[in-house]
Regions:
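Selective transmembrane helix interface/packing segments
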Residues: 1-280
Length: 280
């Protein structure tokens, strides 16, 4: 560790060190914000389902059960982490890490404002789609490493479904690039009447284009923009294996799907990655 710190001290200028420190702080802020959003979504989902079923839902821990997700998270962290005897232990250990890392890596290029993003990549959309598709690898690893029929079948179902809907999601996202081109947004900047503008893959530039024209592309290019948004929303639900596209986790057939053999902290990583991908 000391050698690493000495290397940084001798090779980084104060300006570079400050820039890297700001990136690390920004990443930690995003991680904390997404984690809080995951907790809020989990509580809200449970309360809505409870009221739909004429129940109250979580009510005991905190006012109206607001602290129930924190209690559940603590319970998962304290539970025994069991690894099946015949599992491929290295792959079994790596699978949830691959899934959660890919889910959070997509936030690197997602803008939270005109200038607020970890980095502004000129291929931001391609980066997001590419990294999100890597989550399929972690799911297949989880199913294979468990050395059980049910997780393997669940992982194969999930990977097939995710690959299938990535085509529709990609086409819907490409429509945003076409809309920026029609709005006069070029690769090198924004300006009305951009002439030979060919659109941009930078997500910050797409956000600025809509901000400058004071209207979302969904409404400006109605009904095509609304149709593209609808296709993206449906594909997103299918990509995250949420109802009604939760076939990989069909309880009547495959119990919990590809993470049947996981428990404790490793199971919570799959849970966190699923909700983080939904928010992204």
């Amino acid at each position: 560790m000391s050698d690493f710190l000495n290397y940084l001290n001798s090779n980084l200028t104060p300006g570079q060190a400050g820039a890297y420190l700001w990136v690390v702080i920004y990443i930690l802020i995003i991680f904390a914000a997404v984690s809080v959003a995951v907790i809020a979504m989990n509580w809200l989902e449970r309360k809505i389902l409870a009221h739909m079923q004429v129940r109250l839902g979580p009510m005991r821990v905190g006012p109206h059960g607001l602290l129930q997700p924190f209690a559940d998270a603590l319970k998962l962290l304290l539970k025994e982490d069991i690894i099946p005897a015949n599992a491929d232990k290295l792959v079994f250990w790596m699978a949830p890490l691959v899934v959660v890392i890919t889910a959070f890596t997509t936030y690197i290029v997602i803008p939270f404002g005109p200038t607020h993003a970890v980095t502004d990549m000129n291929i931001g959309i391609l980066f997001m789609l590419g990294v999100a598709s890597l989550g399929t690898l972690g799911i297949i690893m989880a199913g294979w490493a468990s050395n059980s029929h049910y997780p393997l079948l669940g992982s194969l179902r999930s990977s097939a479904q995710m690959v299938s809907y990535e085509v529709a999601m990609g086409m819907a996202v490409v429509s945003a690039v076409l809309m920026t081109s029609l709005s006069g947004v070029g690769v090198y900047g924004i300006g009305p009447g951009g002439g030979d503008a060919i659109g941009t893959l930078s997500m910050i530039e797409i956000v600025r284009a809509q901000m400058n024209q004071h209207v979302w592309f969904i409404f400006k290019f109605f009904p095509l923009g609304l149709a593209a948004f609808g296709i993206f929303a449906i594909a997103m639900v299918a990509e995250t294996n949420r109802a009604p596209f939760d076939l990989p986790e069909a309880e009547s057939e495959l119990t919990a799907g590809f993470h049947t053999e996981y428990s404790g902290f490793r199971w919570s990583l799959f849970f966190l990655a699923e909700y983080a991908a939904m928010i992204a």
